[in-house]
Amino acid sequence: GIAEFLNYIKSKA
């Protein structure tokens, strides 16, 4: 989901 997508990017940051 979108929330998971944002969480993925934040995890990489």
Swiss-Prot record:
The modification Alanine amide is found at residue 13. Signal peptide: none annotated. Inhibits the formation of NO by neuronal nitric oxide synthase with an IC(50) of 55.2 uM. GO terms for biological process: defense response; negative regulation of nitric-oxide synthase activity. This is Signiferin-3.1. Expressed by the skin glands. It is found in: Secreted. One of its GO terms (cellular component) is extracellular region. Keywords: Amidation, Amphibian defense peptide, Secreted.
